[in-house]
A protein has these predicted regions:
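Hydrophobic alpha-helical segments that drive targeting, anchoring, or assembly
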Residues: 8-182
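Long, compositionally biased intrinsically disordered terminal regions
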Residues: 13-16, 22, 141, 146-242
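Elongated, non-catalytic scaffold/linker segments and compositionally distinctive motifs
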Residues: 1-4
Length: 242
């Protein structure tokens, strides 16, 4: 089986600003304790997207816990709903599934169910690999972004809460956020123009800053009709359509 790319979606995909459509604002203060596990769901909705530069898609799947020889034939995002995925098991792990591909020089994994991208972030990022992890967090907002490299989380923040940051270099992306009119030059105060634009537009600015910094892109079709190989990364999901 060969690894899938974003062929058919345009050479550079669709950027990543559109991922704001599956995230959202958080009504309170900073995300407690920094990054947390994403909130999977039972209906095939996306629990996160992992981008990795420096490894092919199959190796990304392996680092996320998959048997690299056990990928399915390419399936669409809608086909995920036909797999037997038990998201939650009392006292045990739920099932985690990913679909993997490559776009713009980055491998990507789209996460479903009880996936592993958050807890294995530093493992994915070892040996010089760069990783950007986006989690929409629909049940526990804000949506979260983390950047890791060489086995360490360098920086992370919530969309709309960029002034609260974590990681070994929490201010790494501040110049990019300032240039995108997300934050004022002090790196703390939100730009008035971003606040007045509404949450969706403000989140697009943040994702646009990350997109430009790292050259990230993901075709919209990857969440829908684009067919990509799928892997089990946790639990015992049924990988044959029901």
């Amino acid at each position: 089986m060969t690894d899938s790319t974003c062929e058919g979606a345009g050479e550079d995909g669709d950027g990543i600003q559109w991922l704001a459509e599956i995230g959202g604002p958080h009504p309170g203060g900073p995300h407690p304790g920094g990054p947390a596990a994403g909130g999977p769901d039972a209906d095939g909705e996306v629990g996160g997207v992992v981008f990795a530069r420096g490894i092919p898609p199959r190796e990304l799947a392996r680092r996320m816990g998959a048997d690299p020889a056990a990928g399915t034939e390419p399936i669409s995002g809608t086909d995920i709903r036909d797999l037997d995925i038990e998201v939650y098991r009392p006292g045990d792990d739920g099932d985690g599934v990913i679909r993997v591909g490559e776009c713009g020089g980055w491998s990507f994994a789209i996460e479903y169910g009880d996936s592993t991208g958050g807890e294995l972030l530093t493992e994915i990022a070892r040996d010089g690999v760069e990783v950007v992890h986006f989690r929409p967090m629909p049940e526990q907002r804000p949506a979260l972004l983390d950047y890791a490299r060489d086995g360490a989380v360098l920086c992370g923040f919530g969309l709309g809460e960029e002034r609260w940051r974590w990681g070994q270099e929490p201010d790494l992306l501040v110049p990019d956020l300032v240039a995108a009119s997300v934050l004022e030059p002090d790196g703390i105060t939100p730009c008035a123009s971003a606040a007045g634009a509404g949450a969706g537009a403000a989140h697009c600015r943040t994702l646009g800053a990350v997109e430009r910094r790292f050259g990230l892109s993901l075709p919209r079709a990857a969440l829908d009709g684009l067919r990509l190989p799928a892997y089990a990364v946790r639990g015992t999901p049924g990988m044959e359509p029901r």
